[in-house]
From Swiss-Prot:
It comes from Vibrio campbellii (strain ATCC BAA-1116). Residues 97-172 form the Smr domain. The gene is smrB. One of its GO terms (molecular function) is RNA endonuclease activity. NCBIfam families: PRK04946.1. This is Ribosome rescue factor SmrB. The lineage of its organism: Bacteria, Pseudomonadati, Pseudomonadota, Gammaproteobacteria, Vibrionales. Its EC number is 3.1.-.-. It comes from the Bacteria.
Length: 176
């Protein structure tokens, strides 16, 4: 044996004698929380928000909308000045939803998800592009939007945001 090996053995024996009779401490003060699966919870929460928002849209209920002129709607507590500002394009949409090629069910779900997203991120103006096509979504989108409690007003979009094939939506953001 070399000199290093004997020193190592002596050190190890000395350490073993020093810690003889020592017991492992039991962790009793800090509780380790199990790691949560945050990604899965985020997915389920966003799906729940979308389905909750979709709850407001009924195909049986038909709100009274102005039939002549461009498509427009305003709640009773919204001034006509706000609708005029929507028409003129003063409000610039931060979110665009393109519903071209969607079924009614898909469009309804995406519309609910868009409104939930806007409320969550405090976005006041959005653009819904329903297209012209066979006029199915063009007729349904205003009816669905008029039923949602977070929609203050909507108006046919100016040409730069889609014209006849789009709506500008003004949303109310609840105070936190």
């Amino acid at each position: 044996m070399s000199k290093k090996d004997t020193e190592h053995d002596d050190d190890f024996a000395l350490f073993k004698d020093a810690v003889q009779g020592v017991k492992k401490l039991r962790q009793d003060t800090i509780i380790q929380q199990p790691k949560k699966n945050t990604k899965q919870k985020e997915i389920t929460r966003s799906n729940r928000e979308a389905s909750d928002s979709e709850f407001y849209f009924s195909d049986e209920f038909v709100p009274l909308l102005n039939a002549d002129g461009p498509t427009r709607y305003a709640r009773d507590d919204v001034s006509t000045y706000e609708v005029k500002r929507l028409r003129r394009g003063v409000y610039v949409p931060d979110v665009f939803l393109d519903m071209h090629g969607m079924t009614q069910q898909e469009a309804k779900r995406e519309l609910g998800a868009m409104i939930a997203y806007c409320v969550k991120n405090e976005i006041h103006c959005a653009c819904v592009q329903h297209g012209i096509g066979k006029h199915i979504l063009k007729q349904k989108a205003p009816l669905w939007l008029a039923q949602h409690p977070d929609v203050m007003a909507f108006h046919q979009a100016p040409l730069e945001f889609g014209g006849d094939g789009a709506l500008l939506v003004l949303l109310s953001i609840p105070e936190k």
